[in-house]
UniProtKB/Swiss-Prot annotation:
Subcellular localization: Cell inner membrane
Pathway(s) per entry: Glycan metabolism; osmoregulated periplasmic glucan (OPG) biosynthesis
One cellular component (GO) term of this entry: plasma membrane
Organism: Escherichia coli O139:H28 (strain E24377A / ETEC)
Function description: Transfers a phosphoglycerol residue from phosphatidylglycerol to the membrane-bound nascent glucan backbones.
Name of the protein: Phosphoglycerol transferase I
Catalytic activity of the protein: a phosphatidylglycerol + a membrane-derived-oligosaccharide D-glucose = a 1,2-diacyl-sn-glycerol + a membrane-derived-oligosaccharide 6-(glycerophospho)-D-glucose
UniProt-listed HAMAP family: MdoB_OpgB (MF_01070)
Example of a GO MF term: phosphatidylglycerol-membrane-oligosaccharide glycerophosphotransferase activity
Membrane-spanning segments: 1-21, 26-46, 77-97, 108-128
Length: 763
């Protein structure tokens, strides 16, 4: 209803101003601004809904604001371009419509009415309401009854007898198992669900609606609310450090805790969370690539589910034979939005719905087959009698190609338990939520029946039963949950440990690189990883007077305030205000001590604008003073006009990438010397090793031969035609995810370049 009211007010404002208000620059600007805000809000809602399926929520703040480079970005490029073009077109059309009667005299009453209607359209819009609620949830003081409902369990299980296998199915909500709605979609896993304890009403609450949040909720009994935004959990060195979670209790009770997934463990800080809470054995894409049968068999996120579950089965066998008490957690990925992936070993590779193939449903049907096969192996083993198997979704499906069909059903998360020691077949329709999962498992294993805000669904009463308004109640508890982080509120002194690549202050530790916004009562960490925006782009969003501490590789800040460090890959610390004074300090000791020193200076807006503009220069447009092309820093020497076919900088250099261009092209501002030596320090990737690699300047071509290790080769060129472009053609670019950013399409690697130098020859 609010959508219709909001749109009606918007339309009325446009029509009244266009036909009645007449000419007035101020009223035109004010009305266009408010109407434009309405458009931006609704496009933001549309874009957020495209990713989350639930509008503007904590998942948007946590995962999408700074994490798109790790979220399968290639699949969202076209929708993103469409949104930008649509926004431009709408603004242009709005301006044209509002100025239709610009030659008529101004009418104050109609102008005021149009502006009020525009303001009303913004206020009534769902996007404004959702953002307002998010802002309120950040600023509340908390709820006095939080302490009464938050309960810490005993740190041990008195007499543990059962091993635990816990399977998180990515977005594998219970709705998929409705055979009437989706016939024969999940026959294998659905049959296993019906053999166990099936909890049919597992609700999704705020702060539990994306993977790491679902894991925190199910293991710690609390939503993931944090004192920072974006993907900062990937940067912290501990995760809810004061809380007792399921992994802590298992470890204290003699369990060895294992976690296996196909994606990179660093994504969203899963490695930090698990290591902080009892898990000593973690396997992700980096750890598995040396042990899996085919390390090249991967999707955009990591290894396929059949590979991951095969490794999980091997680990289950190994641990069961050892006689050691253990827990084995695993997380699938093939059902990740927007389309999912199909493992090659599946029999169920295609599922048609609504008269046509549906990729998301196909991925679900394939993944559930793999999960069921893994469970059936355990059930057929002699160790099943000592094992509890848990299968749950990490969260409800986000906006995938099946989402509109899911939304027609009563949606719930998946949670069922198969007990090898005590077979029990029952569907339990108790009202519950994801936070109850850990408490229920703990109860089955012989521990307490409560965990944080979670309660066992076998012997306790869920918060979802106690509070009819549990979603609002959860948001009211948000400040109380944030306080559980024990996060510092000030930063005066800090220490940088170069061996561990961490910064420590006020009892907290963070991974480097890191940007910090420092105010009187708050310190906000903003990390950089493969999954967040570069720190300089984040810093460019700071206000002129915002205090910052920026710890990064020296060359990244050198172009602003320390040109002498333009080629240094050491750590540097910069601090100050963008509109005031800044200092850059070189970290020259293994353990380096620093102090914050923010001077109360007059803000120079011209300086601020210059700093922001420089911070926003894209990597390929950065230029530095050097007599050679150094590939492990961003940009190129001043003599280079442009270049293409080259991937991003890495610690050693850069790969050629045929996805960006079949050839490596480096165009110089001026013609290359008549006679020169080309000194190339590089290596080859895969089948490009020991193959002739053409290197061209104008009409002259030389051959470069590289191995898999870095070597330096000198080629001699004559350049009678005054050519200004160097071309290198890798003979056989290889499609691979090696060293790739999680969620990105594979790169096509040819040669790895460390340095290229042009040396003029005499004569």
């Amino acid at each position: 209803m609010s959508e219709l009211l909001s749109f009606a007010l918007f339309l009325a404002s446009v029509l009244i101003y266009a036909w009645k208000a007449g000419r007035n620059t101020w009223w035109f600007a004010a009305t266009l601004t408010v109407l434009g805000l309405f458009v931006v809000l609704n496009i933001t809602l549309f874009a957020s809904d495209y990713f989350t399926g639930a509008g503007i929520n904590d998942a948007v703040l946590y995962t999408l604001t700074n994490s798109l480079t790790g979220a399968g970005v290639s699949k969202y490029i076209l929708p993103g371009i469409g949104i930008v073009l649509g926004l431009t077109a709408v603004f242009g059309a709005l301006g044209w419509i509002l100025r239709r009667r610009r030659h008529h005299p101004h009418h104050f009453g109609y102008s005021l009415l149009a502006l009020l209607l525009a303001l009303g359209s913004v206020d009534a819009s769902p996007a404004f309401r959702q953002i307002t609620e998010l802002v309120k949830s950040q600023s509340r003081d908390g709820d006095p009854d939080f302490a009464a409902y938050y309960k810490e369990p005993s740190k041990t299980i008195p007499d543990p007898k059962l091993n635990l296998v816990y399977i998180y199915g990515e977005s594998l909500e219970r709705t998929y198992f409705d055979n009437e709605a989706f016939p024969d979609l999940t026959p294998e896993l659905g049959a296993l669900k019906n053999e166990g304890l099936d909890f049919s009403h597992t609700q999704q609450l705020p702060g539990t609606d994306y993977t790491i949040a679902g894991m925190v909720a199910s293991q710690c009994g609390i939503p993931l609310f944090a004192p920072f935004e974006g993907n900062a959990s990937a940067s912290v060195s501990s995760f809810f450090p004061q809380n007792i979670c399921l992994g802590d209790i298992l470890k204290n009770s003699g369990y060895q805790n294992y976690f296996v997934q196909g994606a990179n463990l660093r994504f969203a800080g899963k490695d930090v969370f698990l290591k902080s809470h009892g898990f000593d054995h973690l396997y992700g894409s980096e750890e598995l690539k040396s042990v899996v049968a085919d390390p090249h068999y991967r999707n955009d996120w990591g290894f396929y589910d059949d590979t991951v579950l095969d490794e999980a089965w091997k680990k289950f066998e190994e641990l069961s034979r050892s006689g050691q008490r253990f827990s084995l957690f695993t997380l699938t990925v093939d059902t990740h939005h927007p389309d999912g992936f199909i493992s090659r070993t599946c029999n169920r590779k295609k599922y048609d719905f609504d008269g046509k193939p549906n990729q998301s449903f196909s991925a679900v049907s394939c993944s559930q087959e793999n999960i069921a096969a893994f469970i059936n192996k355990i059930k057929a083993s002699p160790w099943f009698k000592d094992t509890v198997i848990v299968v749950s979704s990490d969260h409800l499906a986000m906006n995938n190609t099946a989402w509109k069909y899911l939304n027609k059903q009563d949606r719930n998360n998946l949670f069922f338990v198969i007990r090898g020691d005590k077979p029990q077949q029952e569907t339990l329709a108790v009202k519950r939520n994801t936070m109850d999962n850990g408490a229920t498992v703990l109860d089955i294993l012989g521990g307490d029946n409560y965990l944080g805000l979670g309660r066992s669904s076998l012997s306790g009463q869920s918060m979802s039963e106690i509070f009819l308004n549990i979603k609002e109640k959860t948001l009211a508890w948000k400040p109380d949950i944030i306080r559980l982080w024990k996060f510092p509120k000030e930063m005066k002194e800090f220490t940088i440990d170069q061996q561990k690549n961490i910064i420590a202050f006020s009892g907290s530790h963070f991974r480097l690189p890191l940007l910090l916004r420092v105010s009187d009562k708050r310190v906000e960490p903003l990390p950089e990883s493969e999954y967040s925006a570069p720190l300089r782009f984040q810093l460019a969003d700071f206000a002129p007077r915002d205090n910052f501490v920026w710890v990064d590789r020296c060359y990244k800040m050198a172009q602003l305030w320390a040109p002498e460090l333009a080629l240094s890959t050491d750590w540097c610390v910069s601090q100050g205000q963008l509109g005031g004074q800044q200092i850059v300090q070189h970290v020259d000791k293994t353990t380096w001590q620093g102090k914050t020193a923010f001077k109360d200076t007059v803000i120079d807006m011209a300086r601020y604008k210059g700093n922001v503009d420089t911070l926003k220069i894209v990597d390929n447009d950065i230029r530095y003073k050097a007599d050679s092309f150094i590939f492990n820093v961003a940009g190129a020497p001043e003599e280079v006009k442009q270049f293409s076919g080259i991937s991003r900088p890495e610690s050693w250099g850069r790969w050629s990438n045929a996805q960006l261009g079949d050839e490596v092209k480096i165009e110089y501002k001026h013609p290359l010397p008549k006679k020169f030596d080309l000194v190339i320090t590089a290596k080859a990737y895969g089948n490009n090793a020991s193959r002739p690699i053409p290197v061209r300047v104008g009409n002259e071509e030389q051959t470069l031969v590289l191995g898999n290790e870095v070597t330096t080769t000198t080629l001699h060129f004559d350049n009678p035609t005054d050519a200004d472009t160097l071309v290198i053609v890798p003979p056989e670019p290889v499609s691979t995810n090696e060293g790739n950013i999680l969620g990105h399409s594979p790169r096509k690697l040819g040669i790895g370049m460390v340095e290229i130098k042009v040396v003029e020859r005499e004569g």
